[in-house]
Regions:
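Ligand-binding pockets and gating/stacking loops
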Residues: 1-466
Length: 466
């Protein structure tokens, strides 16, 4: 699969938000500091967050229960690590469970998708008054690493894939009031979508001429810096970053996908995104946070799809969980397997979860399940995770409430704790705060769970203990 730039996209390349240029500067009025002393573990070079938008049904997926409503073709069997597992949905992931830690003692704060997704991406409660200034976790990570850019880096620190341009379930959260250099490089793997940073054959000369014109303007700017608008200087910085990326001989290797590998990853937008994530990690070219979106998990109706698909037929055609899980299964298992084979998994931290769980008990009148914040599950892999193959936490027979926590605090694991863990594995002090925000309020990397800070957030240390 060769994703080349179209002629129209080429004309818009200056609008692509990229970072990593030596000319990129952070706003002078925004300062980061910490009043606490923590020791980030720094066990990963990159994080991949697989964001299951809509909220998967925990009792059918990562916390399988054999209920009256459970279809027989979910094929509940013991996986190699002893966990009851839905082989009918995740046969390939069963083969990599010994490389993961399955956490079942997680909960959410909210039951609305956009607020739940805000927690997923920012690690904060949504505030309408501050929404425009609040940066995402990916942009904070980009800010931290912009000052550590190496001369060999040609990719931005933050890459986000498969986010729709608008979504009632929560849009992609970007840089807020941070410098535009911390905004993500967005990649859409839908069929027929071109990527505005790959040069098509025959366009190199045109690209070079535009760069020469920009450099001529830069010469004039040096003669009279005051005459150049600030927005143009930012655009100039982005364009130089884009030039570094587009002219790199490695960029084509990352975004040109081998057909056999695509088949193994499922040959879907989800599979292609995970395959590109693998290539980005292998390139070691500056990317630190990869956010991959898979929508469609909001199964208020027909969670088990069409009932007229017989066992033995292609269950993916049934829709509902069957289709989504098949896409995730091939993509997730392919990513974990390939990173492990390339000795990259130990330095890559992978998180796979949704914003909340779904209602236990009987299906609703539409044959679906509604929102349930009391229980959700996640898969973690790599990045220093120890004793993979184990399970942390447990729920009751209906997956309705947590019955065993398996971690140091006497409460469920919340989104803020996941955020703190991601910062920690990247070597970032999660207790930092940024002053000088437009609202006058500090932005804390991870917000305490109460206005007084009495209930603090922390990394999930048990992931890294044998």
């Amino acid at each position: 699969m060769n994703l080349n730039i179209s002629r129209r996209d080429f004309l818009r390349v200056g609008a692509v938000t990229l970072s990593g240029s030596p000319l990129t500067l952070l706003p002078a009025n925004l300062k980061a500091s910490s009043d606490e002393k923590v020791s980030p573990r720094g066990s990963a070079d990159c994080v991949v967050f697989v964001n299951l938008v809509g909220g998967p049904s925990q009792m059918d997926t990562f916390d399988l229960k054999e209920l009256k409503t459970t279809p027989a073709d979910l094929d509940a069997r013991k996986a190699p690590n002893g966990v009851l597992w839905p082989y009918g949905l995740f046969p390939k992931t069963a083969g990599v469970l010994n490389d993961t830690v399955l956490v079942r003692s997680m909960a959410a704060w909210d039951t609305l998708h956009n607020f739940g997704q805000y927690y997923q991406q920012v690690g904060h409660a949504y505030s309408a008054a501050r929404a425009s200034e609040m940066p995402s976790m990916g942009s904070i990570i980009a800010r931290e690493f912009l000052t550590r850019t190496k001369s060999t880096d040609f990719l931005p620190p933050f890459v986000a894939m498969n986010f729709p341009t608008s979504s009632v379930n929560g849009p992609l959260i970007k840089e807020g009031s941070l410098d535009s250099a911390t905004s993500p490089l967005t990649v859409d793997m839908k069929p027929g979508t071109s990527l505005p940073f790959l040069l098509a054959q025959g366009m190199e000369n045109r690209f070079d001429r535009r760069m020469e014109a920009l450099e001529s303007f830069d010469s004039m700017r040096q003669l009279d810096p005051a005459s150049v608008p600030k927005r143009f200087l930012e655009w100039e910085s982005f364009t130089k970053s884009a030039q570094r990326m587009m002219k790199s001989p490695e960029i084509g290797k990352i975004f040109t996908l081998d057909e056999a590998a695509r088949q193994r990853y499922g040959k879907t937008p989800m599979g292609d995104a995970c395959l590109i994530a693998r290539n980005i990690i292998a390139a070691k070219a500056g990317t630190r946070y990869i956010l991959i979106n898979q929508g469609g998990w909001d199964h208020h109706a027909a969670i088990y799809g069409k009932a007229d698909i017989a066992r033995g037929e292609d269950l993916k055609a049934r829709g509902g969980l069957y289709s989504l899980c098949a896409e995730l299964d091939a993509a997730f298992a392919g990513l974990v397997s390939d990173l492990k084979a390339a000795s990259l998994l130990d330095r890559t931290f992978i998180v796979c979860t949704g914003e909340f769980g779904r209602t236990p008990g009987a299906l609703n009148d539409a044959k679906g399940r509604d929102h349930w914040p009391a229980v959700r599950s996640a898969l973690f892999a790599g990045g220093g995770v120890t004793a993979p193959g184990r399970v942390m936490g447990a729920t009751d027979d209906a997956a309705a409430k947590i019955t065993r926590l398996d971690w140091s605090l006497k409460r469920p694991i919340y989104p803020e704790d996941v955020t703190a863990t991601i910062y920690s594995v990247l070597g970032i002090d999660w207790t930092k705060k940024i002053t000088g925000m437009p609202s006058g309020r500090d932005f804390q990397y991870v917000e305490p769970m109460s206005s007084t800070g009495f209930i603090g957030s922390t990394e999930i240390t048990e992931l890294f203990k044998a």
